[in-house]
Amino acid sequence: MTKARIDARFAELAREGRAAFVPYVMAGDPDRETALAILKGLPAAGADIIELGFPFSDPMAEGPPIQRAAGRALAKGMTLQGVLDLVRAFRAGDATTPLILMGYMNPLVTWGLEAFARDASDAGVDGLIIVDCPPEEADPLADALDAAGVSLIRLATPTTGDARLKVVVRRTSGFVYYVSVAGVTGVKEADAAAVAPNVERVRKASGLPVAVGFGIKTPERAAQVAQVADAVVVGSALVDEVAEAVDMNEDVTARVLSKVESLAKAVRLARRSHEAV
């Protein structure tokens, strides 16, 4: 399946006239068993696509919430092999929900790009977002992923000009991830009115659906962004729920999935203001 799952999901949602809800969770946070329970519960809670972070010791694009989540996962022994094992366990019960890995280049280089692409595809990964791989250096990774049938999903930002955007989207497939605010994750809030023209610009340049992430923390904000984007990504707000549940000795899985349900409902009820892709 791989790439086909992403395309099929966006086609399905376009027919429904709504955006996808994409929760981001960190693999292995707060531990492997809980992370797997959360992962398995996401589709029923309303996730249309899942973004699974793999922990890295120097997550430069992340704000404090996701940095701490990576630290918790690493402290519990989560590895890149462990991440693929989680994906396999998830796929044993779900063959249709697209799953994207998000992380950094160094662990992939250590693994070997071609080998990792094959292993990720075999595990059931549909796409990959690598935060610190610029387009000028992306061809070896893009070639490996293409051969394995896995999408390389690239990032565009508010400061990505038109000429640069052409370079960014050249090897992109699946969708484009639009970073709605400058800076690291979990700090500022997205402004749907400001996001809208850039989302349309990215959509026209790429011919692909556009997901908007960074700065979306509440159902209200998610609904606003869902009116102009093809997908809404929420990450820091969910990893915050993990941290707070751990601190308060609450049921982590139940708390996270409850938050997902409220966000997913808001996205599902929001009607998109542009024609479906």
From Swiss-Prot:
Q: Which Pfam families match?
A: Trp_syntA
Listed under GO cellular component are: cytosol
Q: Which InterPro entries match?
A: Aldolase_TIM, RibuloseP-bd_barrel, Trp_synthase_alpha_AS, Trp_synthase_suA
PANTHER family membership = TRYPTOPHAN SYNTHASE ALPHA CHAIN, CHLOROPLASTIC, TRYPTOPHAN SYNTHASE, ALPHA CHAIN
The annotated pathway is: Amino-acid biosynthesis; L-tryptophan biosynthesis; L-tryptophan from chorismate: step 5/5
User: MF terms per GO, please?
Assistant: tryptophan synthase activity
Q: Which organism is it from?
A: Phenylobacterium zucineum (strain HLK1)
The record's function comment reads: The alpha subunit is responsible for the aldol cleavage of indoleglycerol phosphate to indole and glyceraldehyde 3-phosphate.
Give the multimer and partner information: Tetramer of two alpha and two beta chains.
Active-site residues annotated for this sequence: E51, E62
Q: Which reaction does it catalyse?
A: (1S,2R)-1-C-(indol-3-yl)glycerol 3-phosphate + L-serine = D-glyceraldehyde 3-phosphate + L-tryptophan + H2O
UniProt enzyme class: lyase
As recorded in Swiss-Prot or TrEMBL, the protein's gene is named trpA
Record key words, sorted: Amino-acid biosynthesis, Aromatic amino acid biosynthesis, Lyase, Tryptophan biosynthesis
- Report the protein name in the record: Tryptophan synthase alpha chain
Q: Which SUPFAM superfamilies match?
A: Ribulose-phoshate binding barrel
Q: Report the EC number(s), separated by commas if there are several.
A: 4.2.1.20
Q: Which family does it belong to?
A: Belongs to the TrpA family.
